[in-house]
Amino acid sequence: MALDIKKIEYYNITVEGQVGEGSKLLSVFADVGVNLLAFKAVALESMRTQFTLFPDDGLKMTDGAKKAGLNLDGPHAALLIKGDNDESGALADIYEKLSQADIHVNESSGIADIKGSYGVILYLEQEDCEKAVAALEM
């Protein structure tokens, strides 16, 4: 199982208000040249959404947020993993290796593409990132 593994950071921010607030938020970062590796948006309650943003450049993101008067929660640690084959058991294998290294995954998200590759984001504690990379590269 060949994996491409990248340590990344993520930030959380909650937006409230009317329809279109998410678009305004994402535009703030697009306008300063932030490229998002991934994102997640989850409704917390009516008209309140938490965005989890995974920038390729955390400094650009924090600078853009500061200029726009936005308060980001983060940075937090994560791993972005790309696999070439979404065969049955690929995710189980990743979790097994992390379990054997005594690494707790706080949260994860994944997706497969139509060509058979997949991606997964593992939300980890900062102190577990290097250990997780080592465990997965074995």
Predicted regions and their residues:
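A conserved regulatory-domain signal marking ACT and ACT-like small-molecule sensing domains
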Residues: 1-138
